[in-house]
Curated annotation (Swiss-Prot):
It comes from Burkholderia pseudomallei (strain 1710b). It is found in: Cytoplasm. Substrate binds at residues 9, 41, 73, 87. Pfam families: CTP_transf_like (PF01467). The record marks 17 as: Transition state stabilizer. Its cofactor is Mg(2+). The gene is coaD. Its main location: cytoplasm. GO terms for cellular component: cytoplasm. NCBIfam families: coaD_prev_kdtB (TIGR01510), cyt_tran_rel (TIGR00125). This is Phosphopantetheine adenylyltransferase. It catalyses: (R)-4'-phosphopantetheine + ATP + H(+) = 3'-dephospho-CoA + diphosphate.
Length: 166
């Protein structure tokens, strides 16, 4: 049984992320979507919120597990007995960073492979950062995220507009 880990912040989970999950889950026996705590990135959604969102969008895949993690990816990969790390590449600009990370992961986890996947054409330009920015400026994000994610974004933006006591 081959287990793969698809790690990310998923802040928020986009149609591009789901596209990779759908395709990777057809390749591996189990795909663990690892939602990283990533406090250094100052996420828009809390880890708990991102886990709920990911479960709402991905819960129908029978061989996909959504799990949060903190700390090093290598420890999460080992804890899940994964043999493969799945990473998405949207553009050539992603490649240099991802290539460096794959090299480091190979050093830390010599028996684990990194597999790069590119999104389907219609999702190549989508990023969580851009989706958040559009949502915060009142734009339509419905083509980039699922309806449940759009609802989470709308509610979060409204709560932020009301101030810290909201």
């Amino acid at each position: 049984m081959v287990v793969a880990v698809y790690p990310g912040t998923f802040d928020p989970l986009t149609r591009g992320h789901e596209d990779l999950v759908r395709r990777a889950s057809s390749i591996f026996d189990t795909l663990v979507v690892g939602v990283a705590d990533s406090r250094a990135k100052k996420p828009f959604f809390s880890l708990e919120e991102r886990l709920k969102i990911a479960n709402e969008v991905l819960g129908h895949y029978p061989n996909v597990k959504v799990m949060g993690f903190t700390g090093l990816l290598k420890d999460f990969v080992r804890a899940n007995d994964a043999r493969v790390i799945v990473r998405g590449l949207r553009a050539v600009s992603d490649f240099e960073y991802e290539f460096q990370m794959a090299g480091m992961n190979r050093y830390l986890l010599p028996d684990v492979e990194t597999m790069f996947m590119t999104p389907s054409d219609q999702y190549q330009f989508i990023s969580g950062t851009i989706v958040r920015e559009i949502a915060q400026l009142g734009g339509d994000v419905s083509k980039f995220v699922f309806p449940s994610v759009e609802k989470w974004l709308t509610e979060k933006v409204a709560a932020m507009a009301q101030g810290p006591s909201a």
